[in-house]
Amino acid sequence: MEKSWFNLMFSKGELESRGELSKAMDSFAPSEKTTISQDRFIYDMDKNFYGWGERSSYSNNVDLLVSSKDIRNFISDDTFFVRDSNKNSYSIYFDIKKKFFEIDNDFSDLEIFFYNYCSSSYLNNRSKGDNDLHYDPYIKDTKYNCTNHINSCIDSYFRSHICIDSNFLSNSKNSNESYIYNFICSESGKIRESKNYKIRTNRNRSNLISSKDFDITQNYNQLWIQCDNCYGLMYKKVKMNVCEQCGHYLKMSSSERIELSIDPGTWNPMDEDMVSADPIKFHSKEEPYKNRIDSAQKTTGLTDAVQTGTGQLNGIPVALGVMDFQFMGGSMGSVVGEKITRLIEYATNQCLPLILVCSSGGARMQEGSLSLMQMAKISSVLCDYQSSKKLFYISILTSPTTGGVTASFGMLGDIIIAEPYAYIAFAGKRVIEQTLKKAVPDGSQAAESLLRKGLLDAIVPRNLLKGVLRELFQLHAFFPLNKN
């Protein structure tokens, strides 16, 4: 029987780990003198000693002691000596082949906890849909399974004896990584001296006290965003919600688009107090229309699915309307139609260039024919703006732009610009396939396909959009108020 030392200190004050892990991950030595030689411990490490973070689902930036595929090389007959905060040492012995697990009598409650865990329905009756943090996709592999449950047992035992603030890991994508490993290993894989982390036991019924570093992370986590295509993290204020790893364009709120396009301090919103009054008393078994409106208003901070107003773009006065897909899918109801109509009429009277940023699923079904009439109403005032006054209208199509918006003002711009990879269509792919019983080719409703067919004038990346708009306005004799 070969024995290994693993010094892990849990105190009421600081969480300490006394050991260092080299960059090559080939040595691990205890800080105190023990009866086991350092060479023996290195020998055990060379046999792929497995760390606490075995079930991490997001370990691309974390160097584990051994990867999941090497778990089969785990020592099948091994004893670990563990010391707690009270300087009490006890042994953990297990045999993977025989599924045998034994704890020193000084900590017999851990042994009872393990056997209760293994005898429960978790071992044999779990499925992937149970949302179980300990679900093992290799449940049929005995060695892998047994090792998983040994680690789960030890992990769960310490969880039950240490109070953790649930908000501490709420914003982390690694929340299902082993709890102990999260607090010991940093992203570089080295053991870190966690002088700022304070843990109190259940005796005082207190929560985890996080460090100042984590307070800062909580305060500024809105500055970071995760790509829904490759799951990479990016600083969204710099990258404009465009993934720097895969180039995927993420959705932007209307406020973010206004901030991107309009000069700071020049935005003047219009008709902010206009709200829908449920004109046809729409009845829904799932959720009343007014409740959905209230919920969307609380979520987005907007009164409806569009923001309208005036501002300056590189010093050039413009009228701007920006739709927000987060508000009921950017659907166009009577309020959206009225706000856009008033914006166009104001731009007509003031002889301002007009920009409408479209992001919508189409007409709002909860308002029936009133929502459909907004298509004709907006198109009518646009006709006067473009034909009678000879003013300049730019339509910007973002993903997704579909339905009634595409069939009306979305495609009426003097210049029609789309974002890269934007989904633009009148009827969605699913609707077409169900109606015509024909498959819709992939990419046929993407901006690049529409550009090749002549339905768009240009596809402009976000970082170049403001400069392109400035040049278009100057080409049509719209210049900054103050030339510097």
Curated annotation (Swiss-Prot):
Catalytic activity: N(6)-carboxybiotinyl-L-lysyl-[protein] + acetyl-CoA = N(6)-biotinyl-L-lysyl-[protein] + malonyl-CoA
GO biological process: fatty acid biosynthetic process; malonyl-CoA biosynthetic process
ZnF (C4-type) ranges: 227-246
Record key words, sorted: ATP-binding, Chloroplast, Fatty acid biosynthesis, Fatty acid metabolism, Lipid biosynthesis, Lipid metabolism, Metal-binding, Nucleotide-binding, Plastid, Transferase, Zinc, Zinc-finger
Predominant subcellular localization, coarse grouping: plastid
Binding annotation for Zn(2+): C227, C230, C243, C246
Cofactor note: Binds 1 zinc ion per subunit.
Listed EC numbers: 2.1.3.15
An example Gene Ontology molecular-function term: carboxyl- or carbamoyltransferase activity
Location in the cell: Plastid, Chloroplast stroma
Cofactor: Zn(2+)
Signal peptide: none
Enzyme class: transferase
Pathway entry: Lipid metabolism; malonyl-CoA biosynthesis; malonyl-CoA from acetyl-CoA: step 1/1
Domain (CoA carboxyltransferase N-terminal) ranges: 223-484
Gene Ontology annotations for the cellular component aspect, listed alphabetically: acetyl-CoA carboxylase complex; chloroplast stroma
InterPro entries reported in the protein's UniProt record: AcCoA_carboxyl_beta (IPR034733), Acetyl_CoA_COase_Trfase_b_su (IPR000438), ClpP/crotonase-like_dom_sf (IPR029045), COA_CT_N (IPR011762)
PROSITE patterns: COA_CT_NTER (PS50980)
Family: Belongs to the AccD/PCCB family.
Function of the molecule: Component of the acetyl coenzyme A carboxylase (ACC) complex. Biotin carboxylase (BC) catalyzes the carboxylation of biotin on its carrier protein (BCCP) and then the CO(2) group is transferred by the transcarboxylase to acetyl-CoA to form malonyl-CoA.
Subunit structure of this chain's protein: Acetyl-CoA carboxylase is a heterohexamer composed of biotin carboxyl carrier protein, biotin carboxylase and 2 subunits each of ACCase subunit alpha and ACCase plastid-coded subunit beta (accD).
Protein name, UniProt field: Acetyl-coenzyme A carboxylase carboxyl transferase subunit beta, chloroplastic
